[in-house]
Design a protein with these regions (language model features):
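Active-site pocket scaffolds in enzymes
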Residues: 40-41, 155, 161-166, 170, ...
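Histidine-centered copper-binding motifs that mark active-site loops
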Residues: 39-320, 326, 332, 358-400, ...
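Exposed beta-strand face motif in extracellular beta-rich ectodomains
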Residues: 188-190, 334-336, 502-504
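Polar/charged side chains located within well-ordered beta-strands of beta-rich proteins
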Residues: 23, 275, 340, 388, ...
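N-terminal secretory signal peptides
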Residues: 1-18, 22-33, 40-43
């Protein structure tokens, strides 16, 4: 009997009152059934479908003898600049109308050398979109690239046909208008990036990523000044050009050698302890474990906006695509260093030293601040009526003898390696279905040897519990998210519902893994 069947059987045996108390601790009592997925993983790997379009032409490799840019050539230590704002072309109340032109642009980051980027409106970093709950958006997107693209409004609850999925490409030379209304109670820190079939990772590392902030007319912290820290990374060769991925990038996700904040390398940041800071992990695969020696973070928000109460943190863990809202607490004025401590995510075929990464110098001014006891009233979802199981895995048979394979064999192996429920992604296949407005619990299980951040389109979820090495833990605090890390052999219980009918994606947000097939299609029906 599978975990899903056991849960449903348990629900039938329990009366309504007791079922409302049914939680992750009950799941733990199921023992082996909860610890083991519903399919035998060996047979899944043996029989997984590789009949999808195995077009491996998108898998390109950088030269093996590639020489990278000397870090000393990259300007550093400059005062951090604010993100540019996307101009609202409308003068109508509650209407945000704008244009995003996606095009190549040569930008001089390195003195005397211009780097070819993909850009939104010619800018790196991209312009920040700032809107309010209830606003209606009309964004004209002109694709001036030589390839198809989309814009995915990551985490923003929009209808499926406006979500920039790989099913709705904007072909080279074409344009379209994205139209959607920002729902009430959706204030939070989001971002936008491409989501075309096979090439999301390339288009992001070429420069396409921007901040997207939804504000409430009034919330517990709306009186505070704000700053954005959009963290990305960049790889440049000795000619200051952005090279293709190497094999390790395809296996583990690309981590550029230059970690940037708002497009700047090791900047100086002026902050005050009464500033609301939005931090974005806009990298393809880099995990961030942020800390400020001599100071603490005050966590006030996650992907989906403010949390119930402020939480003091020595470190902030952000998997790729995650965002947080914080303030900084320090005993006095001073100069501090923003760093990212090493996080071992069990990469394939790579040995790393556990080095701490220096990101920026912070000049911090101590200001008076009284945080309210409660930041937001959390409105939990109802108890679940349906359950789903997601198994993220890797086909180790494809990895066998990899270093001895030809380039064409490597490409085929890569395109068949990263799986969800034993399958590699097929654009035309429906993998799961959900009912509109019905609350579901998803059990997301990582049966691979490395970390994978799980992301779902169209909604946000609440983490209910996690299980690792037989130990079940309830979530540390209540919050809505759209992206969450899943460690090797870990099981997460996520509660969610979909409020729009149509097709959605769920996938690993290491973008190379997404492109290589660690993704599925969810059909939402009435």
């Amino acid at each position: 009997m599978t975990i899903i069947q056991k849960i449903k059987q348990k629900e039938k045996l329990m009366n309504r009152r007791n079922f409302l108390k049914f939680n992750a601790l009950t799941l733990a009592s199921m023992g082996v059934a909860y610890a083991n997925p519903m399919h035998d993983m060996h047979s899944m790997h043996k029989n997984h479908s590789i009949n999808h379009d195995l077009d491996t032409s998108f898998i390109n490799f950088a030269p093996k003898n590639l020489k990278l840019l000397d870090p000393k050539q990259f300007p550093q230590g400059e005062i951090l600049k604010a993100l540019p704002l996307l101009k609202n072309e409308s003068k109508e109340k509650n209407i945000f109308r704008a244009t995003l032109e996606i095009k190549e642009n040569h930008i001089e980051l390195i003195k005397g050398k211009k780097t070819l980027f993909y850009t939104y409106n010619g800018l790196v970093p991209a312009p920040k979109i700032e809107v309010f709950e209830g606003d209606k958006l009309e964004i004209l997107v002109k694709n001036k690239l030589k390839e198809a693209t989309t814009i995915h409004w990551h985490g923003v609850p929009v209808p499926p046909d406006q979500d920039g999925s790989p099913h709705d490409p904007i072909l080279a030379g074409e344009e379209r208008i994205y139209r959607f209304e920002i729902p009430q109670d959706s204030a939070g820190t989001y971002w936008y990036h491409p989501h075309p079939h096979y090439t999301a990772s390339k288009q992001v590392f070429m420069g396409l990523a921007g901040a997207f902030v939804i504000k409430a007319k009034k919330d517990a912290l709306s009186h505070l000044k704000e700053k954005d820290l959009m963290i990305s990374d960049l790889r440049l060769d000795e000619n200051a050009q952005i090279p293709n991925n190497n094999l390790n990038d395809w296996l583990n996700g690309r981590e550029g050698e230059f970690v940037l904040i708002n497009g700047q390398f090791k900047p100086k940041i002026k902050l005050a302890t009464n500033e609301r800071i939005r931090i974005y992990n806009a990298t393809a695969a880099r995990y961030l474990n942020l800390r400020i020696q001599g100071a603490k973070f005050i966590l006030v928000g996650t992907d989906g906006g403010l949390i119930e109460k402020a939480i003091y943190k020595e470190e902030l863990f952000l998997s790729p695509a995650s965002r947080v809202e914080v303030l900084i607490d320090a005993p006095k004025d001073g100069n501090f260093k923003l760093e990212s401590a090493y996080y071992d995510r069990d990469k394939m075929m790579v040995k790393e030293e556990s080095n701490t990464l220096f990101l920026a110098n912070i000049n911090l001014k101590k200001e008076k601040l009284e945080l309210p006891k409660n930041l937001k009233i959390f409105k939990p979802l109802e108890e679940p009526k349906e359950f789903k199981e997601i198994i993220m895995s890797e086909d180790h048979m494809q990895m066998h003898g990899m270093m001895g394979k030809s380039e064409s064999e490597l490409k085929i192996a890569l395109a068949s390696m990263f799986l969800i429920n034993g399958k590699s992604y097929d654009l035309k296949r429906i993998d799961l279905s959900s009912k509109l407005g019905v609350v579901e619990d998803w059990i997301v299980i990582n049966k691979s040897h490395m970390d994978h951040p799980f992301h779902i389109h169209g909604t946000q979820f609440e983490l209910i519990s996690s299980k690792l090495n037989g130990k079940v833990q309830k979530a540390e605090f209540r919050a809505f998210r759209d992206t969450i890390n899943v460690r090797p052999n870990e099981e997460l219980r996520l509660r969610m519902k979909q409020d729009f009918k149509g097709l959605r994606m769920y996938h690993c947000h290491i973008l190379e893994h997404e492109d290589l097939g660690m993704m599925g299609n969810l059909e939402v029906k009435e």
